[in-house]
A protein has these predicted regions:
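N-terminal first-folded block
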Residues: 1-48
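Internal alpha/beta domain cores that form substrate/cofactor-binding pockets in large enzymes
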Residues: 1-2, 21, 25-29, 61-72, ...
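Short glycine-/acidic-enriched loop or helix-start segments at secondary-structure transitions
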Residues: 14-15, 60-62, 82
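Amphipathic, hydrophobic secondary-structure cores in small proteins
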Residues: 29-30, 39-45, 49-76
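C-terminal structural segments of small proteins and small subunits
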Residues: 68-108
C-alpha cells in the first residue's frame, strides 16, 4: 500500500512497514496543507493510508466518503513508540479503504 506520514509521525516507523511505499507530507511538498486539504491531496495522489499522530483528526475532519484509511498513533516520540511499533504495523496492514483506526499505545 501507499502510506503517507503526517508531519509529526516518527519517520523510523517506515523501516518496519515492509512491502509498503512510504512518503512524508514534506516529501510530497504538502507540509503546509491543513488536514482536510492534505487528505484530499493524498487521495488524489493514490495514497491508501494516512498515518498521523493527530488524535483530534476524526473530530476536525468529515471522514465520510473518504477512500483513504486513517491510522492514528498517540505518540510522537520514537523512543517511547519503538517497543510498540508492531501495533502500528498491524494497524496499517489491516487498513481498508475509508477505515479509521486509533492505535492504543501503552504509556509507561
Amino acid at each position: 500500500m501507499r502510506v503517507l506520514f503526517d508531519q509529526a509521525t516518527p519517520v523510523p516507523i517506515r523501516e518496519f512497514l515492509i512491502g509498503h511505499t512510504v512518503r512524508t507530507a514534506a516529501q510530497e511538498q504538502w507540509d503546509t496543507l491543513a488536514n482536510g486539504d492534505l487528505l484530499t491531496a493524498a487521495e488524489h495522489a493514490g495514497f491508501e493510508v494516512f498515518l498521523t499522530t493527530d488524535k483530534n483528526i476524526r473530530h476536525q475532519q468529515n471522514m465520510a466518503g473518504r477512500t483513504i484509511a486513517v491510522v492514528v498513533i498517540g505518540l510522537q516520540q520514537w523512543p517511547a513508540l519503538r517497543p510498540h511499533v508492531a501495533l502500528v504495523v498491524d494497524a496499517v496492514n489491516a487498513a481498508t479503504p475509508g477505515s479509521f483506526t486509533e492505535v492504543d499505545i501503552p504509556v509507561v
